[in-house]
Amino acid sequence: LSTKIHHLTDGNGLPLVVLVGAGQAGDSPMFPILLSHLRIEREGSVPTRTRPDAVLGDKAYSSRAIRALLRSRRIEAVISEPRDQQGHRSNRGSGGGRPPKFDAQKYKGRNVVERSFNAVKQWRGLATRYDKLALTYRAGALLHAVFLWSRHITL
């Protein structure tokens, strides 16, 4: 069958977590798994960071479950709300609740994520897709992440 790459990136478009899921599955069910794998090592005796300041996501990640997860971990959700959810909320009137907080200025930084995915998909090792096993496909995605990080890091 088919596979799909899921990854979390930092503000520079560098992948922090890379996973491969089923191609026919949605993106939002993989989000809690991606977030649980997030580990950012820091220099010295500073503890490992597992909580980002904010998560920028598209409308596919605008679910109550994801927003509740982010709220429970004190992570700011910068996720646009789909029109159908806006309509359902307004149809319920005062019982529909307030719209979720949305920072349009921060959301403009989401293009970094899209450019990161574009770079992964344009890389010949993954674009040609000779790998038949999900394991080797993930290995290729991780190798591409290593290339990106090696270009970024200066010694």
Model-derived features with residue positions:
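Solvent-exposed alpha-helices and their adjacent loops that cap or buttress functional pockets
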Residues: 1, 8, 47-49
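Conserved active-site beta-strand-loop modules that form the wall/rim of enzyme catalytic pockets
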Residues: 4-6, 14-17, 27, 53-54, ...
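Conserved, well-structured core segments
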Residues: 4-7, 17, 118, 135-144
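Short conserved beta-strand segments at catalytic cores or DNA/RNA-binding microdomains
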Residues: 4-15, 24, 31-35, 116
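Active-site beta-loop-alpha junctions of metal-dependent nucleic acid enzymes
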Residues: 19-45
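Generic alpha-helical structural context detector
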Residues: 33-36, 118, 145-148
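Helix-centered, glycine/charged polyanion-binding patches within enzymatic domains
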Residues: 43-133
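Charged phosphate-binding loop/patch that engages nucleotide di/tri-phosphates or the phosphate backbone
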Residues: 140-155
